[in-house]
């Protein structure tokens, strides 16, 4: 995306005028300016310079009395579903942006773009061309917190190929939207053994030491990359004027740790030589989605890392998170050796959390065609994402044998004091959430005046459930209804036919125990339940978001199998007792553990 379209040009503008403008602002270009009536085009050296040119010139620079418009040059055949939205207020919450984008159609993907500007930029993929066309018409110039959004097409290199292929878009299972393998085994949807290489080690280093890390003409950093077999990106242009700069290290876990050690040694030596600090702490950046599991229940995981490595570890507060900054800063203080050991333990936990989320996500994408966590802000956009379901840009196959449109009702229990935050001012937040998720969301009346928990009733198809519940979990964390070292775990209830409850439990509790071990959620069928007027009983699920979602989907899968068998002439002998004779399940041993792999 390094070719630029320069529009709204006065007829008096010449190629020399554009050359001078680019040179005045020190924006490099390659080749010549191709002049047409009212517009021109030119190539930039790379995507980053093209983005810099757009941010510098578009709507800001005048030539012969007219403000020029600069955007990516996109051939008509590639103006399909992909848009770039610029000038987004940096402190805007994801859910607000999601709600706005979702008004114009299904958002398949939404990724933030790293830029030098103070405002945020995202690339968005809509479900259809028409949805993208409507979004560009409605959102271009849209005023958001005194910022006028700028929206333009970006090239969809796959569009011409897709139009020549069948309804499956010519994509092979296990391949991403552009046909490139994303570290997946083709057709499997399962992460390959090299998946860890997709989790970069992100460090935050004082700006004053960046020069020493890079070295004269890049000699030092080339030496680090060569010795550690890694790729290192020093983001010098991010957050101009900031006291610290991020560094991304891409390699094996061992390669990342070796590069980290060398960088830490260089910084400490530079601090000693310049007498600027006695020691330089190690700062690791980790996406907020993983931090809760790094901390552990009551902070146990973090305390163990501190004790085992003889370090002091602190984590930045949740209040620092914004659309522009989804990462938390983990600060490690101690000797160089101790800090390096702590880095290994920290990243081990982060990678485990990532792998478990990938596993949960693969379950979701298998059961809910077209589901994309990146599109709803629940998964780090920088991570390698599992491939979309086959034929992601066309209507997906039905959800299981029962069809995709089947409505589900889930009761989610939240702290009573969180109700106001979930509803929002004049009901604005809950309305946005409902629109975004495509689900009905209602707050049930309190069971008693002093009730500590309130029931949220979520009704909608599987993907809507996933989006809505994910946002509810996220809102509670954002609003600090759970402590900084506490993972959000909620209780959800789903109703199942009394005749099918035994199948959920399994013979001797085997099914429910396997379910708990697989999902790390607590699954409880309370004893001595009396079926309601619809002959249904409640199944309780307690756990963090991914655990709860996977448990819900597995239970729904069991219920679908029961319905199939009933249609085929009876479900046979139940594998468990009648619900009135059930025994209450205790807390599973695996509740605080990672799901077992089979």
Swiss-Prot record:
SUPFAM superfamilies: Eukaryotic type KH-domain (KH-domain type I), RNA-binding domain, RBD. Residues 162-171 have a biased composition (Basic and acidic residues). Residues 155-195, 561-598 are annotated as: Disordered. GO terms for molecular function: mRNA 3'-UTR binding; N6-methyladenosine-containing RNA reader activity. Residues 198-263, 279-346, 407-472, 489-555 form the KH domain. The modification Phosphoserine is found at residues 185, 587. The modification Phosphothreonine is found at residues 573, 583. One of its GO terms (biological process) is nervous system development. It comes from the Eukaryota. GO terms for cellular component: CRD-mediated mRNA stability complex; cytoplasm; cytoplasmic stress granule; cytosol; filopodium; growth cone; lamellipodium; nucleus. It holds the Pfam family RRM_1. Residues 574-583 have a biased composition (Low complexity). The modification Phosphotyrosine is found at residue 399. Keywords: Cell projection, Cytoplasm, mRNA transport, Nucleus, Phosphoprotein, Repeat, RNA-binding, Translation regulation, Transport. Its main location: nucleus. RNA-binding factor that recruits target transcripts to cytoplasmic protein-RNA complexes (mRNPs). This transcript 'caging' into mRNPs allows mRNA transport and transient storage. It also modulates the rate and location at which target transcripts encounter the translational apparatus and shields them from endonuclease attacks or microRNA-mediated degradation. Preferentially binds to N6-methyladenosine (m6A)-containing mRNAs and increases their stability. Plays a direct role in the transport and translation of transcripts required for axonal regeneration in adult sensory neurons. Component of the CRD-mediated complex. Belongs to the RRM IMP/VICKZ family. This is Insulin-like growth factor 2 mRNA-binding protein 1. The gene is igf2bp1.
């Amino acid at each position: 995306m390094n070719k630029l379209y320069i529009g709204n040009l006065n007829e008096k503008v010449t190629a020399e005028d554009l050359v001078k403008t680019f040179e005045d602002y020190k924006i490099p270009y390659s080749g010549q300016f191709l002049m047409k009536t009212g517009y021109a085009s030119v190539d930039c050296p790379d995507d980053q310079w093209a983005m810099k040119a757009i941010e510098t010139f578009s709507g800001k620079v005048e030539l012969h009395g007219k403000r020029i418009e600069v955007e990516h040059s996109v051939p008509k055949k590639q103006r399909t579903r992909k848009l770039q939205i610029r000038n987004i207020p940096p402190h805007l919450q994801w859910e607000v942006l999601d709600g706005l984008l979702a008004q114009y159609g299904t958002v398949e993907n939404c990724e933030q773009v790293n830029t030098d500007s103070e405002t945020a930029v995202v690339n968005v993929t809509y479900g259809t061309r028409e949805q993208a066309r409507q979004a560009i018409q409605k959102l271009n110039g849209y005023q958001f917190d005194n910022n006028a959004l700028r929206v333009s097409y970006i090239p969809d290199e796959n569009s011409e190929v897709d139009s020549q292929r069948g309804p499956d878009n010519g994509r092979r299972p296990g391949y991403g939207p552009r046909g490139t393998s994303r570290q997946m085994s083709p057709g499997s949807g399962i992460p390959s053994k090299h998946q860890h290489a997709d989790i970069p080690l992100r460090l935050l280093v004082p700006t004053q030491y960046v020069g020493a890390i890079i070295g004269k003409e890049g000699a030092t950093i080339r030496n680090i990359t060569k010795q550690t077999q890694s790729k290192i990106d020093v983001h010098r242009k991010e957050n101009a004027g900031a006291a610290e700069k991020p560094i991304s290290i891409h390699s094996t876990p061992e390669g990342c740790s070796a590069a980290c050690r060398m960088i830490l040694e260089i910084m400490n030596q530079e601090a000693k030589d310049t007498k600027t600090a006695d020691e330089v702490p190690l700062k690791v950046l980790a996406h907020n989605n993983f931090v809760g599991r790094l901390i552990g229940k009551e902070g146990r995981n973090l305390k163990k890392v501190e004790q085992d490595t003889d370090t002091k570890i602190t984590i930045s507060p949740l209040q620092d998170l914004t659309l522009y900054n989804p990462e938390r800063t983990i600060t490690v203080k101690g000797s160089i050796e101790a800090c390096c050991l702590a880095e290994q333990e920290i990243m081990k936990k982060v990678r485990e959390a990532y792998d478990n989320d990938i596993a949960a996500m693969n379950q979701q994408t298998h059961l809910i065609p077209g589901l994309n966590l990146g599109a709803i802000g629940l998964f780090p956009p920088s991570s390698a994402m599992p491939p979309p379901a086959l034929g992601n840009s066309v209507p997906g196959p039905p959800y299981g044998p029962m069809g995709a449109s089947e409505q589900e009702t889930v009761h989610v229990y939240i702290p009573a004091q969180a109700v106001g935050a979930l509803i929002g001012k004049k009901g604005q937040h809950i309305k946005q959430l409902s629109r975004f998720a495509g689900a009905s969301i209602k707050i049930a009346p309190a069971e008693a005046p002093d009730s500590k928990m309130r029931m949220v009733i979520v009704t909608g198809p599987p993907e809507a459930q996933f989006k809505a519940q994910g946002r509810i979990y996220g809102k509670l964390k954002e609003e600090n209804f759970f402590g900084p070292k506490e993972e959000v775990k909620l209780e959800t209830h789903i109703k199942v036919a009394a005749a099918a409850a035994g199948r959920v439990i399994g013979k001797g509790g085997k099914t429910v125990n396997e379910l708990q071990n697989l999902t790390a959620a607590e699954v409880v069928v309370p004893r001595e339940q009396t079926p309601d007027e619809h002959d249904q009983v409640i199944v309780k699920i307690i756990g963090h978001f991914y655990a709860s979602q996977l448990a819900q989907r597995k239970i729904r899968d069991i219920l679908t199998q029961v319905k199939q068998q009933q249609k085929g002439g009876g479900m046979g002998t139940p594998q468990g007792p009648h619900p009135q004779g059930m025994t209450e399940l205790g807390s599973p041993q695996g509740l605080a553990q990672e799901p077992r792999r089979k």
